[in-house]
From Swiss-Prot:
Matches recorded under Pfam families: tRNA-synt_His (PF13393)
One of the protein's GO biological processes: histidyl-tRNA aminoacylation
Species the sequence originates in: Clostridium kluyveri (strain ATCC 8527 / DSM 555 / NBRC 12016 / NCIMB 10680 / K1)
Location within or outside the cell: Cytoplasm
Database matches in InterPro entries: aa-tRNA-synth_II/BPL/LPL (IPR045864), HisRS-like_core (IPR041715), HisRS/HisZ (IPR004516), HisZ (IPR004517)
UniProt miscellaneous comment: This function is generally fulfilled by the C-terminal part of HisG, which is missing in some bacteria such as this one.
SUPFAM superfamilies tied to this protein: Class II aaRS and biotin synthetases
Molecular function in Gene Ontology: catalytic activity, acting on a protein; histidine-tRNA ligase activity; transferase activity
The organism's place on the tree of life at top rank: Bacteria
Family note: Belongs to the class-II aminoacyl-tRNA synthetase family. HisZ subfamily.
Name used for this protein in its record: ATP phosphoribosyltransferase regulatory subunit
Amino acid sequence: MANWRKYIPEGTKDILFQECKKKVQVENILREIYINSGFLEVKSPTLEFYDVFNIENSTLPQEKIYKLIDGQGRILALRADMTTPIARIVGTKLRDAVYPLRLCYTSNVYRVNESLNGKNSEITQSGVEVIGIKDINADAEVIIMGIKSLLNCGLENFKIEIGHAEMFKALVEDANLDYEEKEKLRESIDTKNFTALNEILHENKGKFEKSSLNVLKELPKLFGGIEIIEKASCLTCNKRAIKALEDVRKVYEIVESIGLGEYLSVDLGMVYHIDYYTGIIFRGYTQGFGGNILSGGRYDNLIAQFGENKPATGFAIDVDGIIKSLETNGNFSDKNDEKVLVYYNKQNFKEAYERAQSLREKGIVAEITHFDEEKEAREYAHSKNMKFLKI
């Protein structure tokens, strides 16, 4: 039997020294912008009951969730995302809170991934949730918060793509498609797989109104600037679809009005987690990171599954993705702290400690060495790029 004592599971990693410092730095930047914007920080247990995530229209299939059994035979789960536990907290512990609620978090989440696919099983997410307000301005505020968060971390070359969950729903609402057919159609549009899309629409063309069929064919192509909304409006008379387009336009214009339009684009073919999201949806991409570095949207039906019917919108940022992108693009501001090694003889520990403490109070990293020989201490200081102070 193999002994795995010296190894860690696939999809996890040890975070050491400078990398750990960078991660804390990014987390603190994000936390500061949230708190300064009136958000209150929450943390949920790493272990939840599996039932918390086994809900209608979950964003994660059950095979992506790590499960274990407690001493009473109940199924537990490692926290698979943060939004669902926050919905549980709101629905059970914050019923009498003053709304709207502005909550923020930074926590690790855990997801099962296929072996050797390069994805992490342990992910650090940081994000916000605005709960109890169903207004397009709240959607815009959350997107602005996402843009400001990425900018404050030092990212420059990124885009936030905006879409709407109702667009796809409106176009397929009258089609007699079963769940599997609808899911294949959704996936082909979201991944912009035109071959699969044309095949699905051809096989089911008798189930769609002609106008809806034409829009669905064009949906993956409808991405770009705000002009895409006008183009899409000319393709459909569906009232739900037109309302969705107006929502996207309003959000875009609000964000643009405060000078952040350069970070926006429209993607009406964005149709991920379509049963979970209920309104504006968005994803952020940046150079140096393969996946989406930020994702979010409006989810007005989730909290009701935990006892309180509250509308909500929010986003999650991939903290490790930010670090990777900053490193790839050479944008990471990693100032070297001044470091001093304090060497003393055995009779002078008190003086050495007081001198080191004085340096620390000035923001200087001060380490007391316990080497007997001064030569060894100097070599140690040189190897760690530290100044040498002899007491």
